[in-house]
Design a protein with these regions (language model features):
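Conserved "HGTGT" condensation-loop signature of ketosynthase/thiolase-family condensing enzymes
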Residues: 1-75, 96, 108-176
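Blade-loop segments of beta-propeller domains
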Residues: 77-80
Length: 176
């Protein structure tokens, strides 16, 4: 199998950008990542674009138009909280399988206000699943409580994860 390497990364500063489209936001991050490794848009052989909120809007294809690259395969990924990670994994897998040599993985989202970025309003996600919670944090909280009951995990141990994550975010000048 072919080796796969991450050769360029970047991200835009977290924030709200009401004057910009999701593809424009993703294009900025994509160009910054390409600049980081000295590649050009012409080097890209495929795009794996993670986006959940506007998933029906062909964000990947529109992102490519923004950066001036068309005519290459695009895979748009929507997988709840794992959307970006899934796009990255699929990009990696395409290289490992020998399908491509240079691919771009982008995760981009523009959340609205409200539950799940406003996507849980009328016709959206109100309640679902056995827990009837409708939000991933509530579902993860239930999973955590079950883990604690079954394994003796303490609230202090869960809190340490939050502290660790916050400490890591303080090292990122682009974090909120």
């Amino acid at each position: 199998m072919t080796d796969a390497y991450i050769v360029g990364v970047d991200m835009i500063k977290f924030g709200r950008f009401p004057d910009r489209t999701v593809p424009q936001i993703g294009a900025q991050a994509a160009l910054m990542a390409l600049d980081d490794c000295g590649l050009t848009v012409q080097d890209i052989q495929a795009l794996y674009c993670g986006n959940l909120g506007q998933a029906s809007g062909m964000v990947g294809q529109r992102l490519l138009q923004e950066i001036g690259q068309t005519g290459i395969p695009v895979v748009n990924v929507a997988n709840a909280c794992a959307t970006g990670a899934t796009a990255f994994r699929e990009a990696w897998a395409s290289i490992k399988a020998g399908l491509h040599d240079v691919v771009l993985a982008v995760g981009v989202e523009q959340m609205g206000k409200g539950l799940l970025g406003g996507g849980a309003g009328a016709g959206g996600i109100a309640k679902e699943g056995l827990l009837g919670s409708g939000t991933m944090p509530a579902i993860f909280a239930e999973a955590g409580m079950e883990h604690a009951r079954n394994n003796g995990t303490t609230f202090e141990q869960f809190a340490k994860v939050s502290v660790k994550n916050h400490q890591h975010s303080t090292l990122n000048p682009k974090a909120m």
